[in-house]
């Protein structure tokens, strides 16, 4: 299959981490004209992915069906040194990319009037907008409504004002474990991060495979680094809702072919502005609505990158444990990579 349809892709000999026969976008490839996809092309792609990812009509697990018990056992067998690293960012305060921040309040503390001799407790409470542009979270399969349906043809009116009757985050109440694979796109391109508006193509994913001597396999928990957090630390917060790097919609075809289990990014997974005229969040539509693929948004990969570089390996056992929130459309998440 030809994956170079979107973006001017050229051989770049001598680029860090690239073989001469691996193509990557040239420096001007972030321009919208290079990557623009019509709505008709997008809808045709959505239908292909929907058909390719179909399970039985009653299925509610989606791409999680690609992760077998044998896959989990094999991933556990890859633990060699016993080191762990979090893939979540600290919960964020108010900023340009976080206009509706989490509210963390102390309910009881040593400063309160209830303080006395003997036993007392420090307690707190947390209120969080799960689907923002700052905090690490997992999207449930009920999160994306498109053309009147959720994943696998479930009617969108099952997502009610009181919660989701179908496809809620409770689908993953028993957790997810498997082989995690980090694909570090800035490393392959020889830059610290991708600029907002840049697109990760299927060719970028293939180049990362080659550079890291690893391959996206069935059931993998695939993590695509664009360097969002690194850029945020360097230049400061910006309105990520309007401008961010992410996957190009066409790259989902490769991930569907490989039958991955989960997809995550240190950004939103979707590029902004959208590459598809008239369709916002096209990657969310394709991944969640068409493929039944749980997404992890706004993760933190910088500690993970350092450990991967130190150990010279980019795969690991990964464990995801979302909150047990019946009828929830998502959950805060703290993925743990184990090496």
PLM feature segments, named:
Residues 17-31:
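Short, Lys/Arg-enriched N-terminal segments with co-localized hydrophobic residues
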């Amino acid at each position: 299959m030809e994956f170079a349809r979107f973006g001017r892709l050229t051989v770049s000999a001598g680029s860090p981490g690239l073989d001469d026969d691996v193509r990557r976008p040239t420096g001007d490839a972030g321009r919208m004209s290079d990557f623009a996809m019509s709505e008709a092309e997008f809808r045709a792609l959505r239908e292909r992915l929907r058909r390719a990812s179909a399970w039985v009509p009653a299925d509610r697990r989606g791409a999680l069906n690609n992760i077998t018990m044998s896959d989990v056992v094999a991933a556990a067998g890859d633990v060699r040194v016993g080191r762990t690293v979090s893939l979540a960012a600290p919960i964020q305060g108010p900023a340009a990319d976080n206009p509706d921040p989490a509210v963390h309040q102390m309910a009881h503390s040593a400063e309160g009037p209830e303080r006395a001799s003997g036993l007392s407790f420090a307690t707190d409470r947390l209120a969080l907008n799960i689907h923002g542009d700052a905090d690490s979270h997992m999207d449930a399969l009920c999160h994306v409504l498109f053309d009147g349906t959720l994943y696998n043809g479930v009617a969108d009116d099952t997502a009610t004002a009181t919660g989701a009757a179908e496809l809620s985050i409770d689908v993953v109440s028993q957790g997810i474990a498997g082989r995690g694979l980090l694909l570090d796109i800035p490393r392959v391109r020889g830059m610290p991060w991708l600029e907002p508006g840049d697109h990760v193509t299927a060719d970028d994913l293939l180049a990362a495979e080659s550079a890291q001597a690893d391959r996206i396999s069935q059931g993998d928990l695939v993590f695509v680094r664009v360097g969002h957090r690194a850029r945020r630390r360097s230049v400061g917060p910006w309105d990520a809702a309007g401008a961010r790097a992410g996957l190009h919609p066409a790259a989902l075809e490769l991930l569907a072919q490989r039958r991955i289990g989960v997809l995550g990014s240190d950004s939103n997974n979707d590029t902004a502005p959208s590459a598809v005229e008239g369709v916002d969040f096209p990657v969310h539509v394709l991944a969640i609505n068409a493929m039944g693929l749980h997404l992890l948004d706004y993760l933190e990969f910088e500690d993970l990158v350092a450990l991967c570089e130190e150990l010279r390996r980019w795969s690991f056992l990964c464990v995801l444990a979302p909150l047990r929130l019946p009828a929830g459309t998502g959950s805060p998440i703290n993925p743990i990579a184990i090496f």
